């Protein structure tokens, strides 16, 4: 035996005490230490509050991302117990509060006591103690029995004992934590991920109010999630931009006794005129993306009830096709939620429910309720049946079209290389395919590419809008057929096979004009609706060709966006410049000048925030009241109504909410007060205020330039200062704006857009499937009014010089 080898005996066995195991192997407890694991920390804390709500003790949860990167979760539940925990105190030989036990001992909490909670969620039962272990700092505040208590921890270890803070009328628990950068690859919370989950929880728990805020972004308004209709409201939300077959979603609920106690099952369902099935399933509020026994039971009962109804009413006399579950679920939007006392999940991340008794409960509840509904609502039942028959006929037609496409593709494969310019590499993991707009750009891309691993697929014009088309029509579209054949992985739920994908990266490269944006959206719609796994597995990217080429003598650089262009021009304009405030003789150069410019840019950002909310800055300035200041809120009328007004305090806001009919008006928070005060304070240092941006000041601002000392320029508003410096930056440079890829030669295309060492790609990911479906339906679907309303509400945020006319 090599003496260097260590003996494997009892001394090699390590026992990790307390929360040390969580810190040593965090992936075992939260899945990973990336963006997913980071957000699971928030879910664990929120799930505790939801458990309180499900038990009937909590009606409101507030989640707020702090400006310094922390996050705070507050509820109005019973509050975590703070009394001495007898068993743990005896074990440790000191007084240990129940709060400390909950926050420092794995698998400790009320959810393991069926008298406290009948059902509960949570990730793996490790709860808030896991959050504590993986946080650089955590502060728990409990409001209970008219008193406030607090305790602080660092990486799971108590920093302060449980302390009485003050008298308080509040009730509940507040958790503030900061993720540990030693554990997580990123500690930056993504609000879209959090909002998706909070919205789900508000839908799944009828009547609870969840409020979300993000202090990092001055333009972000507080969002309140409250849905009295529960999952019925969820289905209405999912179908809001679709043409529903009937007005109100069907709601089904029932309770049956399972192996471990009562199982509560509820479902809401509604068909629309579209062709996509959209079904979300949950168990104890946890999304089960791979379904499980509750979804199987629901689908089985749905198919059986509809087939039975067709047979009982002799509705199939002119339709001899055998119906499938796929036919029945075409255009179906449904949400299924089950509450199980002892849920059994398959896999560590709870993707699939495994309780066998849930399937029979779902079949009983759905079967009985849907049968009664169809008998009581024969018109709705007939509309559903008619749609099912049309879906079956379309399925047969699509099957023939698919077979024809595959047969034609096999017999006429020599035609494919004429479109697809393939690469030499055969390992899909090393290959990428550019989908390029037009033959001209395709030619440049072919010449500029690295032929070893980059394939080029030019497409002509705008492809079919698949949001408005059945599969039969999709298979008949030449451009889509070419894309399907080039990728090699098939299409649709039954025929898609990711392992046959020929290119690991699919890069959409279109022009920077309106047509290019439209083609990109059509392609993304196709991938999202019919090759969703490509987006879920992060195979789709969007190329970012430059918008400008800026040349100065022999030097040049490429610029990707208007914002980058503005920054570059300002940098050039301030390099050799100075600013003199005439009234005080104060002069700014170098870093001091840059700081002043940044203050002006903060003012511009503030103005943009207002104008995105349809509040003109000039109007905002006019609303100033002596002794009160600027307004805080705007009471906005509903679309097509008149009579908005400004509000100057929280008291005015509360009065307005009490007096006005809330469906006719909405309260818009104009800005974050702290941010506004900070901008005002910075401006005061220069003898200015917020109105200085537009209203001419007595304090003359003189811009001087070292290259031309005699060409000083006097400004009287901050807007003039910014515009003059940008114009100064334009002197001596040549600016070329690219509208099409064809305007670049092969070398330029390679240098800017195709070279992996230098290019910028946008990674297409699916953070919020509900919101993605909502956006694609609104922008690409049949319903015009929602699209018009979206365009009208966002029109003010479009810069005029970005419009392609």
UniProtKB/Swiss-Prot annotation:
GO CC, alphabetical: chromosome; cytoplasm
Pfam families documented for this protein: DNA_gyraseB, DNA_gyraseB_C, HATPase_c, Toprim
Ranges where the Toprim domain occurs: 431-546
Positions of Mg(2+) 2 binding: 511, 513
Main location: cytoplasm
Top-level EC class as recorded in UniProt: isomerase
Catalytic reaction annotation: ATP-dependent breakage, passage and rejoining of double-stranded DNA
Residues the entry annotates as binding Mg(2+) 1: 437, 511
UniProt name for this protein: DNA gyrase subunit B
Organism: Chlamydia pneumoniae
Gene: gyrB
């Amino acid at each position: 035996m090599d003496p260097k080898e260590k003996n494997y005996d009892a001394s090699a066995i390590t026992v990790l005490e307390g929360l040390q195991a969580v810190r040593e192997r965090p992936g075992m407890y939260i899945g990973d230490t990336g963006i997913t694991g980071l957000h699971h920390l928030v879910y664990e804390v929120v799930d505790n509050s939801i458990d309180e709500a499900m038990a009937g003790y909590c009606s409101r949860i507030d989640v707020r991302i702090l400006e310094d990167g922390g996050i705070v979760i507050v509820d109005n539940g019973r509050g975590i117990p703070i009394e001495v925990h007898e068993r743990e105190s005896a074990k440790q030989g000191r007084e240990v509060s129940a709060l400390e036990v909950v926050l420092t001992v794995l698998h400790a909490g009320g959810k393991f006591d069926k008298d406290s909670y009948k059902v509960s969620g949570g990730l793996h039962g490790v709860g808030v103690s896991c959050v504590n272990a993986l946080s650089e700092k955590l502060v728990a505040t409990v409001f209970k029995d008219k008193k406030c208590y607090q305790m602080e921890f660092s990486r799971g270890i108590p920093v302060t004992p449980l302390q009485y803070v003050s008298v308080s009328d509040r009730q509940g628990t507040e958790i503030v934590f900061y993720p540990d950068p030693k554990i997580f690859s990123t500690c930056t919370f993504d609000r879209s991920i959090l909002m998706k989950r909070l919205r789900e929880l508000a839908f799944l728990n009828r009547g609870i109010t969840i409020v979300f805020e993000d202090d990092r972004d001055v333009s972000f308004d507080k969002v309140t999630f409250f849905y009295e209709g529960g999952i019925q409201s969820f289905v209405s939300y999912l179908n809001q931009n679709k043409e529903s077959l009937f007005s109100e979603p069907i709601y089904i609920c029932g309770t049956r006794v399972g192996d471990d106690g009562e199982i509560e099952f509820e479902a809401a369902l509604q068909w629309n005129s579209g062709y996509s099935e959209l079904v979300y399933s949950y168990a104890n509020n946890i999304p089960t993306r791979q379904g499980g026994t509750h979804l199987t039971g629901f689908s089985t009962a749905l198919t059986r009830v509809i087939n039975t109804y067709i047979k009982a009413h002799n509705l199939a006399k002119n339709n001899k096709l055998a119906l499938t579950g796929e036919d029945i679920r075409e255009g179906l939007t449904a949400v299924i939620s089950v509450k199980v006392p002892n849920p059994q999940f398959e896999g560590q991340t709870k993707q699939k429910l495994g309780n066998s008794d849930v399937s029979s409960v779902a079949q009983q509840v759905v079967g009985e309720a849907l049968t009664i509904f169809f008998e009581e609502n024969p018109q709705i039942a007939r509309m559903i049946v008619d749609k099912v028959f049309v879906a079956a006929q379309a399925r047969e037609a699509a099957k023939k079209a698919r077979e024809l496409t595959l047969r034609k593709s096999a017999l006429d494969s020599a035609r494919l290389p004429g479109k697809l310019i393939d690469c030499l590499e055969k390992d899909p993991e090393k290959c990428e395919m550019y989908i390029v707009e037009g033959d001209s750009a395709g030619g440049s891309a072919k010449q500029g590419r690295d032929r070893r691993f980059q394939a080029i697929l030019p497409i002509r014009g705008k492809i079919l809008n698949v949001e408005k088309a059945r599969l039969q029509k999709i298979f008949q579209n030449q451009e889509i057929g070419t894309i399907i054949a080039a990728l090699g992985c098939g299409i649709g739920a039954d025929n898609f096979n990711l392992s046959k994908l020929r290119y690991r990266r699919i890069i959409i490269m279109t022009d920077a004009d309106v047509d290019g944006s439209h083609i990109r959206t059509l392609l993304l719609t196709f991938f999202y609706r019919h090759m969703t796994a490509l987006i879920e597995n992060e195979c789709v990217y969007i190329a970012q060709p430059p918008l400008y080429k800026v040349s100065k003598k022999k030097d040049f650089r490429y610029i990707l966006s208007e914002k980058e262009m503005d920054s570059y021009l300002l940098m050039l304009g301030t390099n050799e410049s100075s600013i003199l405030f005439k009234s005080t003789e104060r002069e700014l150069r170098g870093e001091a000048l840059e700081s002043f410019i940044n203050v002006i840019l903060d003012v511009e950002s503030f103005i943009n925030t207002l104008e995105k909310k349809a509040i003109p800055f000039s109007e905002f300035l006019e609303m100033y009241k002596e002794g009160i200041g600027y307004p805080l809120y705007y009471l906005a009328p509903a679309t097509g109504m008149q009579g908005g007004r400004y509000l100057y305090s929280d008291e005015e806001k509360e009065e307005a909410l009490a007096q006005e009919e809330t469906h006719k008006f909405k309260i818009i928070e104009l800005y974050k007060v702290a941010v506004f005060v900070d901008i005002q304070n910075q401006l005061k240092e220069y003898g200015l205020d917020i109105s200085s941006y537009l209203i001419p000041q007595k304090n003359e601002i003189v811009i001087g330039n070292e290259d031309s000392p005699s060409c000083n320029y006097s400004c009287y508003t901050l807007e003039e200062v910014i515009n003059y410096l940008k114009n100064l930056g334009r002197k001596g440079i040549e600016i070329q704006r690219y509208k099409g890829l064809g305007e670049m030669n092969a070398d330029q295309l390679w240098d800017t857009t195709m070279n992996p060492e230098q290019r910028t790609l946008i990674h297409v990911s699916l953070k919020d499937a509900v919101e993605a479906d909502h956006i694609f339906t609104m922008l690409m679907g049949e319903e015009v009014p929602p699209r018009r309303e979206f365009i009208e509400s966002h029109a003010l945020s479009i810069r005029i010089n970005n419009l392609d006319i």
